[in-house]
């Protein structure tokens, strides 16, 4: 156990690092494993519902899944103006996966870290204080940035597919500032290219930091509440948990919607 509040907070904000000496190339095992489990959980539940779907007597889980699918499909139809069969499944995956990652923040702060400490000490003889386990993948900037980089790759890929490699390259040099004069176009090309690079870089950065910042702040507040006397934990923790349900849902929805918007803009000509 932590000897004081500072150690307690530091311990709960430290990731399970695969190899601290590896620096940039080290892996946050807890983030990776929890994300993988949640991804499999989402896929398994939706696959099970699809196999057991019934028109005559749909169950509650089927109705709930259909409601989510309809919500996502409606947003895609309203926002994405191109033609692609993968946008709706992609948006559904993003929304559900990010929501499940965010939802991990609602579990008791000490539940998983203490379980990891017990397993580490009992089966591997590890010192409990040196066993770390964070269960909110979206509170890890590495995870949110990895997802946003994947979105950036999709943006570039969709843009090239819609406009061709030459058309995409031309757009990098001729938008947002145009000139019918060849000399003016040459002068504006470096400026346009710089603007396009800034725009491309801003999208993944804003996506990742928005999600990370909200979930990191939420996790930190839960940790601070856990330091209070037991009675106050319930008085403050319950209202914050209820409010946090709105936050985790909203952040998953925002991440999904911005991805759809960015992909829609990518296939439209300037």
Swiss-Prot record:
Q: Write down the CDD domains for this protein, in alphabetical order.
A: ATP-synt_Fo_a_6 (cd00310)
Q: What's one GO-annotated cellular component? A: plasma membrane
Localization of this protein: Cell inner membrane
Q: Which InterPro entries match?
A: ATP_syn_F0_a_bact/chloroplast (IPR045082), ATP_synth_F0_asu (IPR000568), ATP_synth_F0_asu_AS (IPR023011), F0_ATP_A_sf (IPR035908)
Pfam families in UniProt: ATP-synt_A
Q: Enumerate the transmembrane spans.
A: 29-49, 87-107, 108-128, 140-160, 182-202, 220-240, 241-261
The GO molecular function terms of this record are: proton-transporting ATP synthase activity, rotational mechanism
Q: Which domain of life is it from?
A: Bacteria
Q: What is its main location?
A: membrane
State if Metal-binding is listed as a keyword: no
Q: Which SUPFAM superfamilies match?
A: F1F0 ATP synthase subunit A
Question: Which keywords accompany this UniProt record?
Answer: ATP synthesis, Cell inner membrane, Cell membrane, CF(0), Hydrogen ion transport, Ion transport, Membrane, Transmembrane, Transmembrane helix, Transport
Membrane topology is:
Multi-pass membrane protein
For this entry, list what GO says about its biological process.
proton motive force-driven plasma membrane ATP synthesis
Q: Which NCBIfam families match?
A: ATP_synt_6_or_A, PRK05815.1-1
Record-stated family: Belongs to the ATPase A chain family.
Protein purpose = Key component of the proton channel; it plays a direct role in the translocation of protons across the membrane.
Assembly, per entry: F-type ATPases have 2 components, CF(1) - the catalytic core - and CF(0) - the membrane proton channel. CF(1) has five subunits: alpha(3), beta(3), gamma(1), delta(1), epsilon(1). CF(0) has three main subunits: a(1), b(2) and c(9-12). The alpha and beta chains form an alternating ring which encloses part of the gamma chain. CF(1) is attached to CF(0) by a central stalk formed by the gamma and epsilon chains, while a peripheral stalk is formed by the delta and b chains.
Q: Which HAMAP family does the UniProt record give?
A: ATP_synth_a_bact
Protein name from the UniProt record: ATP synthase subunit a
Which species is this UniProt entry from?
Answer: Chromobacterium violaceum (strain ATCC 12472 / DSM 30191 / JCM 1249 / CCUG 213 / NBRC 12614 / NCIMB 9131 / NCTC 9757 / MK)
What is the phylogenetic placement of the source species in the record?
Bacteria, Pseudomonadati, Pseudomonadota, Betaproteobacteria, Neisseriales
